[in-house]
Amino acid sequence: MKKIMLFLAMTSILSACQPNYTGKYIEIGDTLTDYTKECFKENEIPYKYEKGKLYIPEDAFDTAIYTCS
């Protein structure tokens, strides 16, 4: 029983620590390189690449600048 409770507690803590970006998508650049894709994936930053423009959620902007530039 203790193992189950510990597992549930750890799962809850880990899921609560993950970022949940919900802001409006804003343009951040023109190019999407392999480095940028990998950095966004590692930092769990969602992105859209449409018509030659790169977009990320507005509330992920600071994280993207600090970690991927």
From Swiss-Prot:
PROSITE patterns: PROKAR_LIPOPROTEIN. One of its GO terms (cellular component) is plasma membrane. This is Uncharacterized lipoprotein YvzJ. A lipid is attached at residue 17 (N-palmitoyl cysteine). Keywords: Cell membrane, Lipoprotein, Membrane, Palmitate, Signal. Residues 1-16 form the signal peptide. It comes from the Bacteria. The keyword Cell membrane applies. It is found in: Cell membrane. A lipid is attached at residue 17 (S-diacylglycerol cysteine). It is a lipid-anchor. Its main location: membrane.
